Amino acid sequence: MATVNKIWLQLGQSWNNGQGGNLHLLQTAYNKRMINVRIMTDNGFECIYPTSNNNQYPTANQNDGVSIEFYFQDIAEHLGEDVYLVKYAQGSTRLQFDNTRTDWNVASVGELYDGTITAINDAISWMNTRGKQYSFEGVVWCQGEGDCIPLSAANEYQQNNIDLMAG
């Protein structure tokens, strides 16, 4: 039986994007090439390698930051298999529709939700081209403070999150 490659979506704002200039803060165990954790980049899935800063996708959002993807090494070791990540994150965003700045709202055209769908389709294409079986295992969503300020964003958060996950 062929291996089913497990893909996780890592989406969100602020700290999920990774904060700039702090790769040196990674514990030694995580500050190395991670052969069992692959992250989607402009070139397809690559092993996470902190010194190459390939953990920031899309590259337009690169800022030399650390976030949760480095710790997926623990999940890969626990499962005894490789983990694939599709990360799409950008700081200073919210789920609430906002026509003055980029947001995650599914009603926004050409913004973060649409970019996420493109990244997912790129991952599917990469797997299919290589004849790999895959399944999407879950979503790791990191909320930012933009979803609690203003109050209207907080009041709409539950429904906006349901809409995002339902796609």
Model-predicted regions and their roles:
Residues 1-167:
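Cell-envelope and extracellular/periplasmic
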